[in-house]
């Protein structure tokens, strides 16, 4: 389901691989990202540039991943479109997750903080 790309300093960008992250696929998404963390990934960028819709289950999966990574690393989001941004704001997730316009900006910011 997910697609990954590795960047410098153990930074991994993750694309969910779906247009809609919902109750139907959020558990699979979470399980696959948690497996990356268990394999040693500690700085993750979730790239939502291809995701047009996100429901509460998708947000729940994302917060579950954040809880799993804990203080061992960092989790940020990038590429949020208007609807996904609105969902983040309504649920106040914009206060929880750092957001960047694209993966490149997220990689640069994370690299500077390592």
Where are these regions (language model features)?
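Non-catalytic signal-transmission and effector/linker regions of two-component phosphorelay proteins
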Residues: 1-7, 111-114
